[in-house]
Amino acid sequence: MNTVASCQTAQRTVVARFEWAVLGLTLSVLTIPLPAQAQFPTKPPAATPLRPARFPAFVKGTLPDGVNMIIVEHHKQPVVTVTLALPAGAAYVPADKTGLDGIVADLLTKGTESRTADQIAAEVEGAGGSISAYSDNDFLRITVSALAENLPQAMHVLADVVMHSTFPATEVDLSRTRSLSALQVELSQPEALAQRAFAHEVYGDHPYGRNYTEGTLRAITRDDAVAFYKAHVKPRGALLVVAGDVSAATVKSLAAQVFAGWRGAPAPAPPVPAIPVRTSTEIVLVHKAGAVQSNILAGFTMITPRDPAVYPLTIANKILGGGTDARLFLILREQKSWTYGAYSQFTRPLGMGVFMANAEVRTPVTDSALAEMMHQLDRLRNQVPADSEIAAAKNYLVGNFPLTIQTPEQIANAVAAARLRGLPDDYVPRFRDRLAAVTRAQLGAADKRFFTTDKMVIVVVGDGTKILGGLKRLGSVRIVDAEGKPLAEADLTAAPTAVAWAADRLVPASYTYRVMVQGNAMGQATSAMERASEGDRQVLRLTSSMNLGGMVSQQDTVTVDAATLAPLHLREGGSQGGQAMSMVLDYQGTHVTGHVHVPSRQGVRDAAVDTTLAEGTLDQNVFSALLTALPLASGAHWMVNAYDGTEGVVRPLTATVVGEDSVTVPAGAFACWKVAVTGGQFPINFYITKTAPYLIAKYELVGPPVVFELTAKTP
């Protein structure tokens, strides 16, 4: 069963559906005939005079319970957004419970003393809106939006989830499971790995630098969630922002009514370790074997939220990496063709923020791209940008600002962010004017003060066997794995596990699966195994097919040696969104040849294959097809090197028995081993029966909501 290929195609389909829709619309527009004599301007029109940005006036107040309140009357749309922010973010969580704030935020809308999770969702949807809660480093926020005429209903629900959440035990378990799945996805995604490593390296043991782990998530109990809620979800010091088609008088009266009886002050934040003071630049290499690209994230601590340097730094960031017309993008992509994009940004939490420059580059140019990024940082520090470059950045930022405060939700977010950071009342209304007033001298002084390359944290996620040498030429390199554990250079070429295949478990049969996307049947997949002969050799032939709603069709045949289970042939064909895809691979010992033509988000990969692999390397599709032949047992773990023809790389795939599960699918109920396969483009969980006949009852992508469920088996 070619499950890896099926999952790859399913994931590409879910992600690409919107992209194909946009492409179709674009093509339809392009086919509209134009007049024969149509003339197109050769120069952009001159800029019109800048119109003043009219920020709506707002009213401040304080409720009897100590909630600070800001009301912004904005009557352009008949909607309203209400945000309640409380000092209850990650900074308030003990290190051994990292992730607790996110679970509490997730659970606030999952049940109260008078409403179930479904009732909360239905009531808010009935008001023409939505409700959500999330946490960041410093704050926990609950936001509800609705039609303005339904503000009372929305406010009552908001107050209920804040004041009367019950944290049902089943919901706690589900939230923890979702967080563990999210962690699995993070540990498989280079961008997320870079962000996790960067935060830890910059902030150290400070709460801003902590990453939740499997251990901290599993340690979180319902009692922990309830205790955190009771200690920190309190009115005194909270901020309520209401923006939309409302009157201040109505909002004040309603807020006092719905929050009546809410009392208390939150527990203070625990003492936190100091942020490390960096004295030199270090490169941290996060080894991801088989990666075809490298993710670079470089930066340093920068400013606190009330530093007036925010205005020149906003302009400097726009010049350096704030868009497709910025230096990093133009040089690394347009001039060098090293990446699809390179950008920069800086953060402003309640404490110390950071500057970050990032790019995802081709593996062979990793060191060159990093060197160029550092050169551009030095250039910005040592050479004040030209007047024309400054003017272009200012014009964009000043002209774009009104677009960021158009809707009630945008206004509420902007006002809340400013107030929570302790910024003055005129910060948002006058932000644009202060940007426009920045002088060239102020910009140069800020660049000289903040931008540096001699005290940086540089994180590179990529295949250490291919990029370590180049990185060493740029500076000191420390190697870690995906979880941040130290690695030695010798660890970059870990030896695969010797697998004692139980070939007798591979019995000829046919299987049918339904493909579920977000709980809805979207298509069908089939697979079959048969014994055959090729000359004097006995082989196993595994065929599979998949159809996803007519958007994707795929057929695969994998042939392996019946005695050794070594790969012999792979044939894959089909189409995705109208694009043909095919893969032909032939294995002769350690030598593989063939051709691939596979659509991807970066375009079509069309390439000949002619490469020599290490002894014992499997085809990744063979590995997934043969999982039922592993001698599965609690805690069992294997690592094999597998060739991925889609990308043309060898990746170490791991299969780990992570537990037991009872699985009910249309074909019946089965007692299964849960086997987590990682190391590919994304993690996959397989549910394999514990007793004969050994089969895959279900398999699922971790992250994207795609599940394959067994519906029938013959014989």
Give, region by region, the residue ranges found by the protein language model.
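Contiguous hydrophobic, core-forming segments of folded domains
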Residues: A371, H375-R379, L548-L632
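N-terminal secretory signal peptides that target proteins for export/translocation
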Residues: M1-A16
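His/Glu-rich zincin catalytic helix
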Residues: A36-A122, T143-A146, H156-V157, V226-I331, ...
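A common structural junction motif
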Residues: D160-F167, V258-P266, H375-V384, L474-A482, ...
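M16 family metallopeptidases and their MPP-like homologs
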Residues: I70-V72, K76-D106, R115-V162, R176-L180, ...
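Bacterial N-terminal signal peptides
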Residues: E19-I32
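Acidic, serine/threonine-rich low-complexity disordered tracts
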Residues: A498-G589, S634-P715
